[in-house]
């Protein structure tokens, strides 16, 4: 597996994962809009045949990074792909000069919360009713980004 920037040929694979992972998936257009943005890193985890195993979207603006979206194909979860994507987001955040990375995660997504906590993310708050499909709360987690993270 390798982590690389998204390309146009990855979009079908990203959309397939997005649509099975989230009740209200991002549109194809939302991903396409991110391609040219200087402050955005849209990454894919690619397998041996260059198939998309997972992806992440992270923005770095004004010294902070926001991990907006991350998903791994359901058949490949538990293999460390999500961890690798988050690690690469942290590395790129450090290289971009961010001092903090934060994210929102569904309050009921225990597996994701365990992963983030194991990577040094800490609880910072709750966004009540954040997810419009169910009204579920979002838990806000963040982590300091250190200069040493750039070398990961």
Each language-model region and where it sits:
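Short glycine/proline-centered loop/turn elements that form peptide/ligand docking sites
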Residues: 86, 109-112, 129-134
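Acetyl-CoA-dependent GNAT
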Residues: 2-77, 86-96, 144-151
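Conserved G/P- and acidic residue-centered "switch" motifs that form tight phosphate/ATP-binding loops
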Residues: 80-82
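Short amphipathic helical patch at the helix-1/turn junction of helix-turn-helix
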Residues: 72, 106-107
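Conserved GNAT acetyl-CoA-binding A-motif
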Residues: 93-104, 127
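Conserved catalytic-core motifs of GNAT/GCN5-like acyltransferases
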Residues: 104, 117, 122-139
């Amino acid at each position: 597996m390798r982590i690389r920037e998204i390309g146009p040929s990855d979009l079908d694979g990203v959309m397939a994962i997005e649509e099975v992972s989230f009740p209200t998936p991002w549109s194809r257009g939302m991903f396409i809009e991110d391609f040219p943005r200087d402050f955005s890193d849209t990454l894919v985890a690619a397998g041996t045949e260059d198939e998309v195993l997972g992806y992440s979207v992270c923005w770095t603006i004004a010294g902070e990074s926001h991990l907006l979206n991350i998903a791994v194909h359901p058949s490949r979860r538990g293999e460390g792909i999500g961890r690798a994507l988050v690690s690469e987001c942290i590395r790129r955040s450090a290289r971009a000069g961010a001092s903090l990375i934060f994210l929102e995660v569904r309050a009921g997504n225990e597996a994701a919360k365990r992963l983030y906590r194991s990577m040094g993310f800490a609880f910072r708050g709750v966004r009540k009713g954040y997810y419009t499909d169910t009204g579920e709360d979002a838990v806000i987690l963040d982590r300091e980004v250190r200069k040493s993270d750039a070398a990961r």
